[in-house]
Amino acid sequence: DQYIAYGADQCFKMYDLFEDPENHLLHQARGFMDDVNAISQDHWSRGNGWGIIGLADMLQYLPQEDPRWQEAARRMQRHAQALARYQTERGLWRQSIACDLAWEESSGTGLIAYSLGVGIRMGVLAPETFLPVLQKAIQGLADYCLHDDFSTELSCHGCLCPGKGKAKGTLQAYLCDVRA
């Protein structure tokens, strides 16, 4: 039980630190730039996927009467609504989610889609709103990212903030990052 409490506490602290109060997306990192307290400007798709999957896990494994379950549900609803606004026409999310110039990315899309599915199954996300978003993501992954030989397209090649020096972690560094 202490490990469950610790895990939930860490997930909520991550949201408290990285959630953008304006668009409710998560920023990627703190401490990778010259200023160790600076938070990256971007809203990295894989980072948002890892965040919401933590909430999805809590919803699956905590009892519903646990106050942490209710908190995870509230945060998932807010984050899922934010993410749905930025899904592309092809059903994917961009590497830097809120930037129309960023390329579409498969791994963040997969993490987000899985989490939306859990939210729907657990009764936290309204199926009439989020099932079309989930279906569009699955179709986008199938159409644009997965090949018959199981190779993939549009995936991030690393996890560190792109860029060097003062440009590290900036939106420009993300836009210039090479696709893998």
Listing of model-derived features with the role each one plays in the protein:
Residues 4-8, 41-45, 49, 66, ...:
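Non-membrane alpha-helical structural segments and their capping/turn regions in soluble enzymes
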Residues 4-28, 73-91, 133-150:
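Long, well-ordered core segments of solenoidal/helical folds
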Residues 22-24, 30-34, 102-106:
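Active-site-proximal cap/lid insertion segments
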Residues 26-46:
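Acidic/Ser/Thr-rich, low-complexity mid-to-C-terminal regulatory regions of eukaryotic proteins
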Residues 93, 99, 103-104, 110-180:
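CBM-like carbohydrate-recognition segments
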